[in-house]
Amino acid sequence: MLYFLAETIFGFICQYVPIGFWNGYSPAPTDRYRRLDLKSSQGFRAEPNLAPLPTTKPRRERYYGPNQIIRAPLDYLLSIPGKDIRGKLINAFNEWLQLPDDKLAIVKEVINLLHTASLLIDDIQDGSRLRRGRPVAHEVFGVAQTINAANYAYFLQQERLSEIGDPRAFHIFTNALLDLHRGQGMDLYWREAVVCPTEEEYIRMVIYKTGGLFRLALELMQVQSNSTTDFSELVELLGIIFQIRDDYMNLQSGLYAEKKGSMEDLTEGKFSYPVIHSIHAAPENSMLVDILKQRTEDNVVKVRAVHYMESTGSFQYCRENLARLTKQARHHVKELEVSLGPNRGIHAILDLLHVQQPNEKPLV
């Protein structure tokens, strides 16, 4: 009985005593949200909004967080320097397109933020632990906040397109995001279903995924210039070269391993370019597929896998194809230089992506 009485009194206080009363706020006689009305048959008459709330600054930031909190996973990864190959590529193509600095800055920011957002999602989907030698963002901020920051970046850059002032930019941006997700979907399917793609399927995935941001950068630049030159084949080649080299270096380079995590593609179960070649080179041997299924972090096992890929000639195959693709790319650049003028920037990027053959002298 006493419990019921106390509960009733507490409910009455919560409903009918002004909020300000508990904060030392002294309301005027009319400052009540509900007033006793002796003339009403119900005894009480609701009078909402009779009293204005005390004039205080909004506390919204306390609950939702300022922009810095929403962006925190993005800014964390942005603070860790990467290769910035996309920024170099934008500068290189601008030797031909000649955009002013303000227009170029928009393209650079859109590409940089989209790339960073895609890395945040990739690291979650791949179960990565390191990115550029530091703990991945979702290990620091949590998965939910990291996903939210990545999605926020997509829409933030979509809004930025209005500064370009060309309706084609939105269409270009949308197509690029669709391509990125198509490529990522193919990559994830092969890994999760443990299905080894053909080399042709892999190249198609790379054109969607890695080449997608390269194409987006160039097309956003072109809508702001008077250029009608078709750069698509060159951009496609650059994307393929970049990704094959990235796959190669993940398994071969000690410096790269220190920064990203030793032979991380094997831990992720990824069908990278040398892995695909090795599996198809000896389909009767299931060792490499078995190692990928394990998602192992054991370096001894991963080194064994790398040695096996050496035995199937897979790394040599990567080097030979990279040399062939680079030769094609340089040929395209020289053809374009006839009408557009010299472009030292793209040649410098191809030099940067060069992988030495055994016994080859380093590029000067």
From Swiss-Prot:
Which EC numbers does the record give?
2.5.1.-, 2.5.1.1, 2.5.1.29, 2.5.1.10
The cofactor named in the record is: Mg(2+)
GO molecular function terms noted in the UniProt entry: (2E,6E)-farnesyl diphosphate synthase activity; dimethylallyltranstransferase activity; geranylgeranyl diphosphate synthase activity; metal ion binding
Q: By its UniProt entry, which CDD domains does this protein fall under?
A: Trans_IPPS_HT (cd00685)
* InterPro entries for the chain: Isoprenoid_synthase_dom_sf, Polyprenyl_synt, Polyprenyl_synt_CS
> What remark does the entry make about the cofactor?
Binds 3 Mg(2+) ions per subunit.
Q: Which UniProt keywords apply?
A: Isoprene biosynthesis, Magnesium, Metal-binding, Transferase
**Keyword Metal-binding in record:** yes
- Residues bound to isopentenyl diphosphate are K83, R86, H115, R132
Site residues (Important for determining product chain length), renumbered to this chain: Y154
Query: For this chain's UniProt record, which GO biological process terms are given?
Result: alcohol biosynthetic process; isoprenoid biosynthetic process; mycotoxin biosynthetic process
Record's Pfam families? polyprenyl_synt (PF00348)
- The record's top EC class is transferase
Protein role: Geranylgeranyl pyrophosphate synthase; part of the gene cluster that mediates the biosynthesis of the indole diterpenes janthitremanes such as shearinine K or shearinine A. The geranylgeranyl diphosphate (GGPP) synthase janG catalyzes the first step in janthitremane biosynthesis via conversion of farnesyl pyrophosphate and isopentyl pyrophosphate into geranylgeranyl pyrophosphate (GGPP). Condensation of indole-3-glycerol phosphate with GGPP by the prenyl transferase janC then forms 3-geranylgeranylindole (3-GGI).
Q: What is this protein called?
A: Geranylgeranyl pyrophosphate synthase janG
Q: Which organism is it from?
A: Penicillium janthinellum
